[in-house]
Amino acid sequence: MEFEAVIGLEIHVQLNAPTKMFCDCPNRPGDRHNLNTCPVCLWLPGAFPKLSQTVLEKAVMTCLALNAKVQPVSAFDQKVYYYPDLPKGFQLSQFHKPLARDGWLEVAADDGTLKRLRIREIHMEEDVARLVHEIEGTQQISLVDFNRAGAPLVEIVTEPDMRSPSDAMEFLRTLRSQVRYAGGADCSMEQGSMRADANISIRPKGSDELNTKVEVKNMNSIRHVGDAIQHEIERQIRQYRAQETIVLHTRLWDPVKCVTVPMRAKFSGPCVPDPSVPDVVISNEWLDELQARLPEMPGQRHARFINQYRLTREEAILMSEEREVAEYFEAVVSKVQSPKLAAQWISAHLLPAIRDKGQSLMETPVTPARLAGLLCLIESSQINVNSAKEVFGLLFESDLAPEEIVEQHGLRQMTDTKELEAIVTRLIADNPVAVQDYRNGTTKAIGFLVGQAMRLSEGKANPKLVRQMIIN
């Protein structure tokens, strides 16, 4: 019997608002323990929460980026449960009246076609405090850090439309790109600003029944999400074939052993309306204003880059997935003749270099204007590719323009035909065997001869001109 998986995701995204959700404390969970606290986020009696307008705006922009229908009225509830990181005994969330419903994202399916995956709802939620485990003497103690308490979150709940680990991974990549474009969050799973839990069940292929699901947590990268889902699918299939009952519970992903392990029985506490936070009312006028502020989104940019710049699908994805990369690319393209050359240098040279140096595109000294200057030198045949790579490395160390670096280091390409003819005459005389091999039809011999010309010219010869001269 063949099986198929039924997968849904619950994704928590920490909004990059400057303050927490219900108070003016800085939204910086990584600061010194308990530095950013007040009576509201410490949940002291008598302290009343007030929803931040900036947080609401970031949340709505996130909903719009995910094609969700923002509700005219949403409301907060108290999600009741007891845990040391939640001393007040409830978490402010939106259960009965979420901020938005009926969103969707289109992702690339396993067969290369586009697949629409639905989002059931998006709701706002305050984050809880963080437990810090330390050793004091011979005992382990747990302390509570309230810096994270009250940090603004949105929870994105999908429909169970995914059928494979790759569906889930592509959904997360697309969501991350969309939300970053909208400016709502940085969505870094590695840094904890995006967390994803997966609900997984299996059924016979072709069936439409929804069987008992298992929740999997503790996945801190998109790759781990895919690995955890694949393992859980295989585990449930083994249980099914052994005629064991699959029970509703939560499991943790162990990235070292690459297995899921039982955590607890699945528990959902009661949710009751919160009396302290007024209903969130959103006007059509404000919604239209925010919609107009959305930038061109990744999918739109991807299609335009293919049509306008004649990039391949893969090149267009690389240049459009991140907003900063897309804007950098278009800034370079505005100054050069070949968009494909710009895309190739950004993907093959610039992005790996700044990653190795721990820089961002905003921080790198290789500005769009400087990279464009380098590419113009290649396009005009003033330098060859090897020299261009040398100049590129020097752009990180020098404030000089690419043209000045070329002059300072004597890297300008030899284009004088008399100089090149002298080199070609010499290498033909010095390499009679390679010349005869070429005349006998051994095409790789021409590559050897061009290489020898580059050696004789100390890398400054124009390889295209040298090749033409040898052939002629």
Q: What are the residue ranges of the model-derived segments?
A:
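Basic, nucleic-acid-interacting segments
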Residues: 1-296, 313, 334-338
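Amphipathic alpha-helical core segments of compact helical bundles
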Residues: 16, 234, 326, 347-355, ...
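Short, basic interhelical loop/turn and adjoining N-cap
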Residues: 457-463
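Extended, non-catalytic structural segments that build the interaction scaffolds
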Residues: 286-293, 330-335, 371-383
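Strongly charged, low-complexity linkers/loops
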Residues: 362-372, 385-456
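Core structural elements
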Residues: 191-204, 269-272, 306-330, 339-357, ...
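Structural motif
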Residues: 1, 333-342, 380-383, 440-443
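DNA-binding alpha-helical recognition surfaces that contact promoter or target DNA
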Residues: 390, 464, 468, 472
